[in-house]
Structures are given as C-alpha cells and as structure tokens.
Amino acid sequence: MKKNTLEKWFNSSWLSGNNQNYIEKIYESYLINPKSVDITWQDKFSDLSKKRKNILKEEKFVYKNNSFKEIKIDKQEILEKKINYIINTFRKKGYKKSLIDPLKLNEQKKYKYLEPTFYHFSEDELKKTVKIDFKNSSQYEIKIRDLYEQLNNKYCGSIGFEYMYIENSFEKKWITKHIELFFKENLFIKKEKIRFLKEILYGETFEKYLGKKFSGTKRFSLEGGETLISILHEIIRYSKKNDVSEIILGMAHRGRLNVLVNVLNKNPQVLFNEFSGINIPKEYSGDVKYHMGGITKIKNDKKKIYLKLAYNPSHLEIVNPVVLGIARASINQLKISENKFLSINIHGDASIIGQGVIQETLNMSQTEAYKIGGTIHIVINNQIGFTTSNPKNLRSSKYCTDVAKMIQAPVFHVNADDIEASIFAIQLALKFKKKFKKDVFIDLVCYRRHGHNEVDDPFVTQPIMYKKIHNHPTIGQIYSNLLISEKLITSNDIEKIIEKYTTKLVQGKNVLSQERNITFQNGNKNFFIKKQKENTQLNFLNIKDLLYSINTIPNSIEVHNRVKKIYQERIGMADGQILLDWGTAELLAYATILKEGISCRLSGEDISRGTFFHRHAFIHDQNNGSIYVPLQNIEKNQGKFEIWDSVLSEEAVLAFEYGYSLFPSNNLTIWEAQFGDFANGAQVVIDQFISSSEQKWNQKSNLVLFLPHGYEGQGPEHSSARLERFLQLCAENNIQVCIPTVSSQIFHLLRRQIFSNVYKPLIVLTPKSLLRNNVARSSLEVLVNENFKNVINEIDKNQKEVKRIIFCSGKIYYDLLEYRNKCDINNVLLIRIEQLYPFPKDEILTILKSYSYVQDFIWCQEEPHNQGAWFYIKDLLSTLLPLNSHLNYVSRPSAASPAAGHILIHRKEQEKLINNAFNFKIA
C-alpha cells in the first residue's frame, strides 16, 4: 500500500459506520459550541465543513454501504438542542454555581457551561420566544433570555440542588418538577414570614442570653446556624398536616440546648439550674446538659404527636443508628405506616464525612432488616471541624455530603442566611421522603460564631474566617431587614418580639405559647418504660408439643440433607430419645416466649443459620429458594418473630438494636456477633450506651448480646470476646454478664431476660464447640422444672475428702472435668460460676458452707493472666473464702494477643493449663 494512500485511509477510518452514532453526538456538541469538544475533533469538523463533501468517497477504501452520510445543518433544530442542553446542564451542574456560602469564604468560580456565551446565542436568539418542556408542563412559552435567568435563579441561587446522579428517572423528574414549579420568589405569605422571623429571633436571643448569664461556660452555641430552629418547627408543622404520630431527633451537642428550649419547650429555669448545679439528681450519676434528651407531646386536634430527642454521648454520629432502631421499633410495635414516623438525624459537616458509622448506617437504610421509610438528614455545615477549616484537611471529596451518593439520596445545599430557601429545602425533603421512602440530605451551610465551645478562641487558628464572621450580620438581622424592606414588620415590632421572649427567659417560663399545646416531660423519668409480664408456668406436655411443632417442616419444602438430619434429631429430642442440644434449647426458648404474645428480634452476621451451623431458624427450599421459618408458624396470636442476617457491620448494627430495645414494650432483642472477638468493632456502643445509659440518663434497655467465646486453637481473632472488658464496665447493677455451659441454661436465661423484673442489658458469652457436644446437653424435664442457675455446684457426688476447689466459667469446665475423670481424681471440686455479674455472692456462700475446712482454692481460666475474669473476680472470691485459705489463679501467661496463632501451641498451652489446675503447689 502506498504511503500517501495509507495515511489518507488512516485519517478517514474514524468515519466508519460503526462510529456513526458516537460521531453524531460529538458533532452536535460541536455545532452548539465548537470549544466544547476536543481540539482534534474541532480540526476534523472544521475541515469537514470546508470540504462540504464526504471524504470517504475520495478513496477506493470507502465502505460500500455508505454508512456515514453528510449532516445537514438545521438551525431551528440546533437552537432546540442548545436550549435542551442548557436546561439539562443547569439541572445537572447548577448547584456548583449556587450561592450557598453565607461568608463567601472562597471566590465564586465561573462555570462556562452555565453562561449564555458558552452556547453562542445571538442577540436575536436571546429575544426569541420558544416552546419548551420546562417546569415539567406540556409546553411552556418563554424567551430564551428569560429562560436562562429562571434557570440561573432556580438552580444557582441560595439552594444547590444536587440530585441528577440518581439512577431512578422517576425520582429525578419528580424533584425537577418541584424545583421548577414551586421554587420561586414570594413563596410565603406575611403570616408565615413573621413566624419564621420569630423562630430565628428566639434562637438568637436565647444564645445571647445564655452567653451573658453564664459567660465563659460551655454551651455549644447554635449562633450562625439558628435557621435550624425554624427548620425543625417546619417539620412539626408538616407533621400536623400529614398525620405524623412520632418524630425522633438525633443530634450532637452543637445547638442542642437551643433545640431543647425552643423546640421541645424545656423550661428555661430547669436548664439554668443545670448550669448552676441546682437540683442535681441523686438517683443516677447524670450527664452534661448538652447530652440530655427528652420527649414532648404536641397536641394536634384530638391526636398527639410525640417529639423525642434521643440522648447521646459526645461520640459524634453514633446516635444515628440508635435513632433508626428507635424508629423501627415504633413502626413494628405500634404497627404504623412508615409515613407516620419521622426520623431526623442532625449532623456536623466534619463528622458526617469523617465518621465511619455514617457509611454503615446509610448502607442499612434500604435493607429489609433496618429500613424505616427514609430519614431526613440535616447537616449543620459551619465549615469547620474544631480547629480545622481547610476542606483539603477535612475530606477527600468536594462536599461533606458526598457520602449520600452511595445510597442515591438527593442533597439540597442551602445558604442558612436565606431562611425562606431553607424552609423550601426542608419542605421538598419531607415530600421526597414521603413519596419515595428514601433518605434525603439538607446541607445547611452556615458558620460558627464562636469557637468549638465558648471557652475557645477561634482567632488563634482561623483569623481570616473569624474576621469575616465578626463583621457578618446575624441571621436575625438579615431577615429582619428583609421583612422591614418588604414593609411586613417594623423595627419596633421586632424589639417587642425580642423583649417579650427575653422576659420569659428572665422569669424562667416556657417560651412556647400554651395554645401550641406543647409541654416538656422529664425524659429521665418517662422516656422509656418497661411493662413487665408475669412469668408463666411451664407444662411438660405443652413444651413437648411445642418442640414438635417448631421442628415439623411441611412436606412441600425440599430441605437440604444436612438440615433435614438436624431437624430429625430435634424430633427425636421431643420424643425423649435424645437430650436437647444448644440450638434446640435456644429455639424452644423463643417459641415459649412467642406463645405468650411477646415478640423476638434477632440480628447478626449469619445468625439465621448460625456461624457454627447450629441454629437453622430458616429452612431454605432447595428447589425454589423460598424460606420457611418454623418460629413464625406456631399459632395465630403468637408474638412476631424476626431474625435478620445483618449487613457486615458491628457498630451501626449493634447501635440500631440498642435503639430498638428501648421501645417500651415486651420485646426480646438480640444481637449476635459472628465471633465474640468482633464485638470490639462496636466498642463505643458498649461503652457509651449499653453499660452506662441507665446511670447517665436513666434510660433502660434489655438488649441481649451473644458473643461466641472459647479457646479452641482458632487464633487471636477467633477465641476471645474480651470478657475482661465487659467485667471492667460492671458497676451499679448496670448489666448482666453470663457464661452458660449447658443447653438448659440458655433456655432459662432467655426466659429470665423477658419475664423477670430485672430490665438490664445481658451479655452472654456463648460456646462454640459445646453447641453439639453431648456433655452440654439437657433433658426436656430440666428445661421444664428448673430455672437458670447463677452457680452450678459439683455434679459428681463421689468427690470426697475435698482438698481443693476449682472455680471456673465457660468451656474450660469440661476440659477440667475430662482431666479429672481421666486421672481418677476424687478430691477436687469443680464449681461453675455461670453469672459473673451481678456476682452471685449468696449462692457461692451457700455452697462453701459445706466446705469450710478447705484451704486450697483455684480460679482457673483459659484466657491469659492479664485478660479474662481473674482481676475482676479475685477480690470478690477472696472475701467469701474460709479464714486462712489461699486463692490462686491458673491461666495462660500474660500476653498482648488474646491467643496463640498456631494450633500446636494452643494445645500445649491448654494441656499445661489443665495440668496446673490440679497440680498447682501452694508456696
């Protein structure tokens, strides 16, 4: 092939028919604006226009079907394409140009594709009236210049609508319609505007009053973001109109006091007393005032709306999944529509993008186990995180709300200085949530007038930012001036509003008028209440029938052979041929609870089958994949049984289940870790909520944690639930910590949790190898006739002339028992402590009365010396032992890691440990 011919072929090959659609799209963009395409394409199209003929026809290598045809330019068509292009560009990218920063910290960027010059409109074209599909109406006549101005006002004003990344076209069209039809000037009438102004002035005056009355005291002011108060009131107004029965708020400390007084109507004098240290509660340790929550009843005609503010610690964003759990419990237990419940989570700009629990929580939002019909997210975006204000140091994305994109949630960025735009944004968000039952985000861009707290001097680290803030008018001033200019109010009227509100603060009176019918209740007394149900007597025949019932699978279901064998064995257990294993006893416990009309909810990774293949609460049909759940088919009036294989999360899932457990009803809520080792992924939930919420907030929970625990050679990440950490948290009867070793014990423990008067979280270190071990099985008679034993005494009556008593907990008991039997030892007692906290002092003393002569006592544990129960239990046991006796420990040596990584090392350690327990010599 000649060189010049080859070059011509190469230069024209891009015109292949295979590329036609692609080239036409690029050519259309070129005709709208030549600079919008790559320079290479500009050259080719420019050359093509000059030649005005198909260059392929010049060569013998032309494609015979003449696939590329010369494009004729239709000016009207190009004009229409330009108009459609500019409309779609504003919808997709208008938010980038929006005026959302009240401080104007950064120079406003110019986006050429949002300017009319980019599209090469002639002056005549700008004046031309066209018919377009704008505002989602059928046809709309408008001049091109006016169209541009409308687009600019709607999409590049005080709200940046970021939503076109959503894949669902119906959702996008719905949002577009509401923006283009309803977002306009003069949205609100005089009455509404005056109401907004009052709410802003209340929030502003409250902060100033607190600042003067308690100067230099931390209050985590809302100043700069008072628009939040009006937004929350708008949510209440929406709830009244839309038959919402409950609203639950989750928020951090920023602005919390303002919300308590100006939204929940907390009495100001009560708050002032908290500042002054007056009337401190004595029955619990309490918490700082900006962590407190509460509940308010709002009368709505003859109905009531319950507005709750969830208690939370300083650990940012962890309250989010707790709020969702509270919401799901209300929806389930009250059997109400998702649209009758509003979940509102209020975030900070640094924490929403910085805290991983947000991603975990959002991931749960549309899953069957955790969805609640969507959440309204409001970000108090004060453009700073403590002392960090450079976005490059705060996040790797442009916006703090970019995490919303992972769940296809729309984001409305709004300038908090524009109150009316902020109200429109929350109205749109509420409508979207109701329509699509999905999460939606309000990015309320504001500022923080003071430092991180009122003691902090922000000028030290943000001098430029705070010079702007110092000279920036307050939101109240801005809106007051606007309404004065609109002749809707006078400065004298405004002074009277402030004066009247201030008088209420001075007098310590509730600031919200009584005709609004809002009263504040002390959440520490009545936030969550447990209604106890009396225990019911078990009947052997009834329990036997129940065991048959939950293990009988319909013939129409094709059961996996391994599962079929398990269920056949369970029928044998009902017949009395086989003792009950752990999984059977556990499921039977749920069945007895469900028969009483009490609901059970279980969640965790692999929980329906069980990590160790022992539960099988779900039966998967091997032919069609359908699922049969025996515990959902006991009888008509049974309680609701839910068991959910959770998302792969510990922190958010456990927090959700904690929130669920707070609902004031008889409900057994259980979270199971895949292995107990992984529970520390949710350590903040354990520390800040489960172990301490009752003492801090008088908030009660009966949540159950199943934590598989036991040293079996599986290495440092699959051996220990970190028992020592739970025991370190034990005080003031806050939780229960149990390590049951027999199947009957888990049966009784679960029933005790729901039927007893004790309403505390329960931590259960569950077994692994014992799940199917014959030595850990129980008879049906034991399940019916006995109760949970905090301590299990020696079971071998042949142990005589006792010289040593070994105390232990958990699986190691069976290793000790095996060694004792193997070595034919008959003078050492093995006593199992099944409940470590509250410590069963009386039961142990009762047992020891028979052995007052024994001087040699051992605490034996599998865990290393610095872990496990030893440092918790040594003083407790020592005070119970006879005089002049000795208490020693046997354990693995102190170690940084919980367990050895190799099975051979594990076996040697275990062998030495068991041998030492029997052969330990007292010095």
UniProtKB/Swiss-Prot annotation:
InterPro entries: 2-oxogl_dehyd_N, 2oxoglutarate_DH_E1, DH_E1, KGD_C_sf, ODO-1/KGD_C, THDP-binding, Transketolase-like_Pyr-bd
Cofactor needs: thiamine diphosphate
Keywords: Glycolysis, Oxidoreductase, Thiamine pyrophosphate
Enzyme class: oxidoreductase
Alphabetized SMART domains for the sequence: Transket_pyr
Presence of keyword Iron: no
PANTHER family for the chain: 2-OXOADIPATE DEHYDROGENASE COMPLEX COMPONENT E1, 2-OXOGLUTARATE DEHYDROGENASE
Name of the featured protein: 2-oxoglutarate dehydrogenase E1 component
Origin species: Buchnera aphidicola subsp. Schizaphis graminum (strain Sg)
